[in-house]
Design a protein with these regions (language model features):
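Beta-strand-rich recognition/accessory modules
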Residues: 47-49, 155, 211-336, 359
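Aromatic- and carboxylate-lined catalytic core of secreted/periplasmic carbohydrate-active enzymes
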Residues: 605-683
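Aromatic-lined carbohydrate-binding/catalytic grooves of carbohydrate-active enzymes
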Residues: 340-489, 500-502, 510-523
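Polysaccharide-binding surfaces and accessory modules of carbohydrate-active proteins
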Residues: 39-49, 53, 73-120, 135-142, ...
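Glycan-recognition surfaces
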Residues: 435-474, 478-480, 530-631
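C-terminal beta-strand-rich structural cap/linker in extracellular carbohydrate-active enzymes
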Residues: 721-745
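Carbohydrate-binding surface patches
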Residues: 227, 231, 237-241, 250, ...
Length: 745
């Protein structure tokens, strides 16, 4: 025994693959082209036994063709013919999609290690060439996980553009395939809930053009705020976690594929039957993809982790958070911004030169907000050019008043006991300005084939601008360039000196790009994510040297940014969060939820349900919260603030527990959530019950394993006592809170 783990044993067995249920059909796909005919062959199977799982490797190419997890018992790979280790792309002139796939190689060595196996490839070959790339591919048991890592030596002057590894091919679900669910979490949605029943590929580029199977790709950071997914069968109480646990911050993608095809317009099941597959291998392949663009050097990536677990995705969430906490520190006392229950956001001027408010009007607007308990005041469109124009010229717009009037307005807002929060950006520049043309264009994010600009724009002040025909455009500019970061930092610190107590940095979630600017000091995959994080890291201590209470909000839900930001800036106008995985994984995290229209009562209810910050932007950021149509909404938010402050240890600073720990029976428009204390010694629990419908509803609440007295709170009503199980009447578009304290017993 070594480190508590048994030494691997490697056994060679000569056998036809019908011993594991099939014949290997070698289908080598290079950029969607078949490069060798389907063939059957006799293969040497190498069995590797680890403490966690028994691995089966193809003895000729080293591919992982079987994973039998020991406890819980699960065969992860059901179709060995889809087993793979890696795919690499080494472009050559006239052939950008020059793939080298592990299934097309002859592995040089398969070596047992104390905790797994190392496959070495001394060179790589395809039907065009043999290249001197050396690959070391490692699979090891570490704790409760199988971990996959890759090392590629590239002595050539050609850059490796893609490395897909940690591939788990041939998956067919857990137990009943149609009962198998999947979670690829975004900030509020599940990007792929039904991989094993309603696979829906083609969500990028040319769809599924260029390949014979169906596939989808999800970028981290980008659509994915966290680097993990989960496959689970709730009925079976079993799942497996699959995650990129590489500490290097760079753009990566999760590739998911269904072989050999999926069916469109299917009622329940988009998978082909075995008969429809016609003997071709059938199953899901997943893998993580890096874009290193490295030559004359060594690229390493990993680990990618696989872990079988009991339960559903909530268990996987804890696995990821446990790993995250070993490397990133976000557990800190909440500062003033994280303690704020509600904001108002207002735009002073837009990109079509419409002046809505001037600097000298801001204190009155902030005073209007405060009378409803709203004490954070976000100011947008204050700078040169108005909202979404003129960036990054972060100086007061002279059409709105003088710099002195701007500073006085911020001082007067602070004197009211309201926090001025200034809207700004990091990685965007208006392409129409002399500043961009003469100075900043050299830092722009460049395309692969030409210095193509990625254009973004949001018009507001005219119909043609709103419809996209005459809007002002901005492009991505990378803060990975130290000179550009310094340019931003000087302006940011001037704003702090002017009296800003914090920033809301907008559009910072736009990170999933490769940047081929030749001036970059980093590789294309690191430009935006590392540049933006470095900006946040530099800004906080520099700003706090001026104002120790300076705080950051940002339109970002990238988990590696959470050490720096206190509130994410987001909207959620849907009835439900399609996935609560990000909120559940990071209970410290919260985000804004907007009320832009006087009728946005249900988003405010959802703010309580999910523990979000209420952000009123009356009449689409134009008016005071005290304007006549918005006044009832503001009064309702004031009541919600009152209730949440009363139980803030649970409802705002506690652990969002999704719907676990309680059960609510009610009509189809009733929703609920559960909050628990983050103090492990506490048994206190709260449930938020929301009626999103147009008619009154009654609901019955039970809290798991708990009986006795509870407190019931509701807007515009005094708190009352009740006994579990409690039946509650909830008016249309209203909510109720039920709180159980240990002291109630």
């Amino acid at each position: 025994m070594k480190n508590g783990m048994g030494t691997s044993s490697v056994v060679s067995v000569k056998a036809r693959l019908n011993r594991i249920g099939c014949m290997i059909v070698a289908l080598v796909l290079v950029a969607g082209s078949r490069v060798s005919a389907a063939q059957t062959r006799t293969a040497q199977i190498r069995t590797v036994d680890t403490a966690l799982a028994t691995l089966r490797l193809d003895g000729e190419n080293g591919d992982l063709i079987g994973v039998h997890w020991k406890s819980p018992d699960l065969e992860v790979i059901a179709e060995p013919r889809l087993g793979e280790n890696f795919r690499l792309v080494l472009p050559q002139p006239g052939n950008e999609g020059n793939y080298f796939n592990s299934r097309d190689q002859s592995v040089s060595k398969i070596e047992p290690t104390p905790d797994g196996v190392l496959c070495t490839y001394d060179s790589l070959t395809n039907n065009r060439e043999t290249v001197a790339l050396k690959v070391r591919y490692r699979i090891r048991a570490a704790g409760e996980q199988l971990q996959f890592s890759i090392e590629v030596d590239n002595p050539t002057d050609r850059k490796i553009s893609e490395v897909m590894y940690g591939i788990i091919g041939g998956q067919r679900g857990i137990g009943d395939r149609l009962d198998t669910e999947s979670l690829i979490p975004s900030w509020s949605t599940n990007l792929a809930p039904n991989l094993f029943s309603r696979f829906n590929g083609g969500g990028y580029g040319g769809g599924n053009l260029g390949i014979r199977y169906d596939a989808g790709t999800f970028t981290y950071p980008g659509a994915m705020p966290m680097g993990w997914m989960d496959v689970y069968n709730a009925k079976a109480g079993l799942g497996y976690y699959y995650a990129n646990q590489d500490l290097e911050t760079r753009v990566m993608s999760l590739e998911v594929e269904l072989h050999p095809f999926s069916k469109s317009a299917s009622v329940r099941d988009s998978w082909p039957t075995p008969a429809e597959a016609g003997g071709e291998p059938l199953g899901i392949t997943i893998g993580w993809v890096n874009f290193p663009y490295v030559s004359h050097g060594t690229f390493t990536a990993g680990p990618v982790a696989l872990q079988v677990h009991g339960g559903d995705w909530h268990v996987a969430s804890h696995i990821y958070r446990s790993w995250y906490d070993q490397h990133f520190a976000i557990d800190r006392p909440p500062d003033w911004l994280r303690k704020e229950n509600a904001w108002q956001s207002i735009i002073l001027s837009n990109s079509e030169d419409v002046v809505v408010h001037r600097f000298n009007e801001l204190p009155k607007l902030a005073a209007d907000a405060k009378q409803y308990g709203i004490t954070t005041f976000e100011i947008l469109g204050w700078d040169m050019g108005g909202i979404d124009r003129g960036y990054p010229q972060y100086r007061p717009n002279p059409h709105l008043g003088t710099p002195e009037e701007f500073k006085k307005a911020l001082a007067d807002i602070r004197a009211l006991g309201v926090h001025p929060l200034i809207f700004s950006n990091i990685q965007f520049a208006d392409t129409a300005t002399p500043l961009f043309r003469d100075k900043l264009q050299q830092y722009a994010v460049d395309g692969r084939w030409a210095p193509d600009l990625s254009l973004h724009g949001w018009g507001e002040g005219t119909i043609s601008a709103r419809s996209g025909m005459t809007r002002s455009y901005m492009t991505l500019v990378s803060p990975a360039h130290p000179e550009f970061r310094q340019f931003l930092m000087a302006q940011y610190l001037d704003l702090v000196r002017d009296g800003a107590e914090g920033f809301q940095l907008d559009k910072t979630n736009d990170l999933g790009w490769l940047d081929f600017n030749p001036r970059l000091p980093v590789s294309p995959d690191k430009s935006l994510p590392q540049g933006v994080l470095e900006t946040l890291k530099e800004l906080l201590p520099a700003a706090r040297a001026i104002n120790p209470n300076f705080s950051l909000a940002s339109e970002m839900w990238f988990d590696r940014a959470l050490p720096y930001i206190d509130v994410s800036y987001m909207r959620m106008g849907e009835i439900d969060m399609d996935s609560t995985a990000f909120r559940y994984t990071f209970p410290e995290w919260t985000a804004t939820i907007f009320g832009e229209s006087p009728g946005d009562i249900n988003p405010m209810n959802n703010g309580m349900r999910y523990g979000f910050v209420w952000d009123l932007a009356p009449r689409h950021y134009n008016d005071s919260v005290d304007e006549p149509l918005t006044r009832p909404l503001a009064q309702y938010v004031s009541e919600l603030i009152r209730i949440r402050k009363e139980f803030q240890d649970l409802l705002f600073f506690g652990r969002f527990n999704d719907t676990m720990g309680a059960n609510v029976q009610g009509g189809p428009d009733v929703r609920y959530s559960v909050f628990k204390s983050r103090d492990p010694r506490s048994t206190d629990v709260a449930s938020v019950i929301v009626n999103l419908g147009d008619a009154p509803e009654s609901a019955t609440l039970n809290i798991d394993g708990v009986s006795g007295d509870v407190t019931v709170a509701a807007p515009d009503q005094p708190d009352r006592r009740a006994t579990l199980p409690v039946r509650i009447s909830v008016p249309a578009h209203r909510l109720a809170i039920v709180v159980k304290r240990a002291s109630d017993n």
